[in-house]
Every structure is written in structure tokens, then in C-alpha cells.
Amino acid sequence: MRRAPRLAASVVLSLASTVSVCTAQVTDVYRDPRMDFGSIQTVAVVPFANLARDQFVAERVRDVFINRLLSTEAVYVLPVGEVARGIAQLGIQSPSSPTPEDVVKLGAFLKADAVITGVVREYGEVRSGSTTANIISMSIQLIETGTGRIVWSASSTKGGISFWNRLFGGGGQPLNKVTEEAVDALMDKLIG
């Protein structure tokens, strides 16, 4: 008789654990209430800052981000080469963390309504005992080019070692899948 409530409780706990493992956490969302986001038609995505161990990870994550943003068809994303040309011609010293003045100059040069910057904080494999899994932690900022003001910002973390990884082993999802899910969670907050 007592087994039925315990079984039901364990099933509910299992489902809750599965759902929490399958979704990316989006935290620290800022949205400027005065900004008309409908006025943003063209965006430039500058190189992301990289705080992870792998030196090429920022470009990989930026590529996934640009592809996902293009697939929404919500805005026109300037080609990477055009953005790089603008950064070089304007002599922007730190393209991954531009000053408000740099954003205004770059926006005018590229005819972009906004500039997107990003930071990859963690990327790769994490280990706990004999269990490994992939993780990504990143943040994105949308900067309006008329003033150089941040009008939207959010962070996303996806992956890591779950209860199920510890219980059954395994390496979690492939790193590209984890990256896509983290970026998609950010897109839902930005576009949705």
C-alpha cells in the first residue's frame, strides 16, 4: 500500500530531474523598457570574448549564435567579413568589448541598428569523479548604435553533470548540441 505513493513520488522526481537537465538556464535578463526593439532591423555581431581554456571557442560559439539568429529571420545579420572590415578600418582596439563610442562609430560605418557582443565564460568538458559531461556558460549583450547603450542582456548555462550522469555514467550531450540549446534559450529571451 505504501509503495504506490513512493513510486509516484519517485516518478515525479525523475521527470522533474529530466526536465531540468534538458533545459538551459537563462539568468540575469535585462531589457530596457524604453527601447523599441521593433526598430532594430540590422545587427552586427562582433567577436565574442573568450574566458574559456580553448582559444578558438569564442569563434565557434559566435558562429552558432549567428546561424541561429539568421534562422529566426527577425533581423538582418551583417556578414562576419563586413563586420571585421569595419572593425579594422575604424581601428577598434578591443572589438569583443567595444566602448559606447566604438559602437556608435561601427553602427554608422556598417549602417547597423545594433551591435551584439558576447562572452564565453565556460566551454568544454567537466569532470566529477569518473563522470564527465559538456558545459557552456555564456552571456550576450545587445547595444543600440545610436547611443552605445546596452538595451538587452542575458546569460545562459547549459550542460554539466546531472544526477543521471552520476547514476548511469555517460558523457552528456555533444558539445555542439549543448551550445545550440544554450543559444536557443537566449534567442527565446531576445526574440520572444
Located regions from the model:
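N-terminal segment of the mature soluble domain
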Residues: 40-47, 52-119, 149, 153, ...
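C-terminal/domain-edge helix-coil "capping" segments
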Residues: 22-41, 106-110, 132-135, 143-192
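Short glycine/proline-enriched turns and hinge-like loops at secondary-structure junctions
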Residues: 57-58, 130-133
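Generic short beta-strand segments
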Residues: 119-124, 157
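Charged helix-capping and loop-helix junction motifs
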Residues: 98-100, 134-137
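Bacterial N-terminal signal peptides
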Residues: 10-20
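Bacterial N-terminal signal peptides that target proteins for export
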Residues: 1-12
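Extracytoplasmic/secreted cell-surface and envelope-processing proteins
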Residues: 125-129
